[in-house]
C-alpha cells in the first residue's frame, strides 16, 4: 500500500492552483440540480449516455500509464505497477455499473450497446486523456486520469448519492442497490485514490519543469471535465 506523506511546498502550491478548477466540477450546476431534482430526465439521460465512452475507456487510459512505469524492481516501480494494475481490474467493472446506473434512470440498454458519438464539448476530455496518457510522462498521465478525474468525482458523488433517491418516484426510473453501485463505489473509496496518485506524482515529477507540466495537465483536464458537464444544459 502506498503511504501518504507530508506534501512538499510545490504540491501545496499545485493543490492551491487547481482548487478553482476542481470547484467548477464539484459545484457544477448539474450536481446542484440533481440535489434539488430540477435536472430534467432528458438532461440526466443525455449525460449518462454521452459520458459512457469516458467511463468505458478509463481503464485503457490507466493501462497506457502502466506501460510507462520504468522497468525493474525499484520501490516506486513496484508500487506504481501494483497500484495501477489493481485499479485497472477495479475500473473494468465500472462500465457495467455505469450501464446499470443509466438503465435504472430510463436509458434504453440498446443506447449503450451501439457506438456513441458524444458532442465535441464532452468528447474533448476523451481526446485529451488519450493524448496525455499516450504521449506525455507517467506523472502527467497520473495527474490527468487518476488525480484530475478521480479527485473531483469522489467529491461530487458524495454530494449526489443521497439526492438520487429524489428521482425514485419518477416514471420509468428504477432505483436499487445495483442502480447506485457506481455512485456508491466512487463516493466511498475515491478519497484515498487521489492522495495515492499524488504520492506517485511526487515520486516521478522531480524537476521544476516536470512539476509545472503536471500542474498544467491537471488544470486542463479539469477544464474539459467542467466543459463537458456544462454542455448538458446546452445540448440535451
Regions flagged by a language model, labelled:
Residues 1-236:
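Non-heme di-metal
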Amino acid at each position: 500500500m502506498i503511504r501518504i506523506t507530508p506534501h512538499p511546498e510545490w504540491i501545496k502550491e499545485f493543490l492551491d492552483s487547481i482548487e478553482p478548477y476542481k470547484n467548477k466540477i464539484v459545484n457544477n450546476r448539474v450536481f446542484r440540480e440533481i440535489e434539488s431534482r430540477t435536472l430534467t430526465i432528458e438532461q440526466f439521460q443525455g449525460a449518462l449516455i454521452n459520458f459512457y465512452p469516458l467511463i468505458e475507456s478509463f481503464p485503457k487510459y490507466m493501462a497506457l500509464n502502466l506501460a510507462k512505469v520504468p522497468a525493474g524492481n525499484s520501490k516506486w516501480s513496484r508500487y506504481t505497477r501494483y497500484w495501477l494494475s489493481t485499479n485497472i481490474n477495479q475500473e473494468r467493472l465500472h462500465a457495467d455499473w455505469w450501464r446499470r446506473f443509466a438503465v435504472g434512470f430510463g436509458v434504453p440498454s440498446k443506447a449503450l450497446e451501439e457506438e456513441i458519438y458524444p458532442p465535441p464539448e464532452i468528447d474533448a476530455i476523451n481526446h485529451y486523456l488519450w493524448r496525455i496518457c499516450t504521449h506525455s510522462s507517467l506523472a502527467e498521465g497520473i495527474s490527468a486520469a487518476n488525480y484530475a478525474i478521480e479527485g473531483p468525482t469522489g467529491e461530487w458523488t458524495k454530494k449526489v448519492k443521497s439526492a438520487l433517491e429524489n428521482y425514485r418516484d419518477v416514471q420509468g426510473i428504477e432505483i436499487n442497490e445495483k442502480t447506485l453501485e457506481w455512485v456508491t463505489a466512487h463516493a466511498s473509496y475515491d478519497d484515498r485514490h487521489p492522495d495515492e496518485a499524488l504520492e506517485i506524482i511526487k515520486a516521478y515529477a522531480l524537476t521544476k519543469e516536470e512539476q509545472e507540466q503536471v500542474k498544467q495537465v491537471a488544470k486542463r483536464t479539469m477544464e474539459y471535465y467542467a466543459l463537458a458537464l456544462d454542455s448538458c444544459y446546452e445540448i440535451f
